[in-house]
Amino acid sequence: MKSKKINFLMGNIKKIGILTSGGDCGGLNAAIRSIFFRANTKYNMEVFGIRDGTIGLTKRPVDVEKLTHETFKGYLLRQGGTFLGSNNKGNNFKFPKNGKVVDTSKLIIEGYKSLNLDGLIIIGGDGSMQILKKLADKGKMNIVAIPKTIDNDVGATENSIGFHTAVDVATQALDNLQSTAASHRRSMILEVMGRDAGHIALNAGIAGGADVILIPEIKYSINGVIKKLNEMKKNKIQHSLIIVAEAVKKEDGSKVMHKYLDGEKRLGGIGDYIASEIMKKTEIECRVTTLGHVQRGAPPTANDRILASAFGVYAVDLLANKKFNRMVAWNNRRVVDVAIDEGIKTYRDVQRDDPLVETALSLGAYIGEIK
């Protein structure tokens, strides 16, 4: 994919908004900062941050903050999460409120129009972009999208904001677990996020030296896992590291779901299942660590800060040139743009021919029943 040249023409885009939607991750504040500086310094635009995603647009008056240089004097660049707040509670066309499901799309569109914005930059994952694109079409909103997700599963971009930070956190966890595994001669199992994509588990597994890497895209067997652990024992290695993505299924094909305090059922618990099955069939002692939200809230890595900053600059240039309904992407070591529809219609999971799969195999990891 060739990089598309942006012509830096001054238009009549003078007032823009930013919102972050969906789950938080490292690099969001860096993106917001970059958007502000490009818009303000290059184009003399006013920039407004909308609080708590689309929820800020449903409030009356709308919940916004005018961004200034003063806003970014502190440590926002280095902080995880988003200082504007976010929301991942579902579809705005079917939004849960006071025990009911309501359509908040009209409120959001009215809120957007009340601000007299010339354009809106949305920072979100595939689900958020799908909903916001639908809102934009209905309300004739001028939007540009920036992809962010620790899962790295947004189509049409090789990298999304937040992924590198999540991998770094998972790698550090494996580093820490290795010493305790060796001390007690145990098998330590680390369960990581990623939804239906195994990018975090695969990348962190390689970086952290995992002996077993289980991802949703490649079928495995408990016997295959045990065979690997027994081979290690024969080589006088009495401890092991296993990393497993949250959407890996049981051997019978069912997903493991956990019911949380809010009543919602979400992916979680596959690590305990793997440990239980290993201990049923062997004398290997297992312990499980579920990494959870620390993958989202950690300070962003240098890679995520750089990617977010580059995305922010490019997104502002798209708005300035009235190139709406585009998504910023990273392909072939360059920032490019694609239609938002292209970004949300494709799903980016781990392919069998991914070079990192072969890398993991070459390093001796068990990664499933690969023929």
Q: What do the predicted segments below correspond to?
A:
Residues C25-I35, L57-T58, V102-K106, L120-K133, ...:
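Short glycine/serine/threonine-rich phosphate/pyrophosphate-binding segments
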Residues G111, I122-G124, Q130-K134, G139, ...:
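Accessory alpha-helical/coil subdomains and C-terminal extensions
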Residues M1-M10, P61-L120, G127, I161-D168, ...:
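Glycine-rich oxoanion-binding loops at beta->alpha junctions
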Residues K15-D24, F83-G85, D118-I122, M188-E191:
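Short glycine-rich or small-residue beta-strand-to-loop segments that form or flank ligand, phosphate
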Residues R266-K371:
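C-terminal non-catalytic interaction/assembly regions of soluble proteins
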Residues I50, L135-S160, L214-I218:
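Short, acidic/small-residue loops that bind anionic groups at enzyme active sites
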Residues I6-P61:
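N-terminal phosphate-binding or glycine-rich loops at protein starts, especially the Walker A/P-loop
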Residues R33-K42, D63-E70, K134-V144, I161-T165, ...:
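A glycine- and small-aliphatic-rich helix-loop capping segment at beta-alpha/alpha-beta transitions
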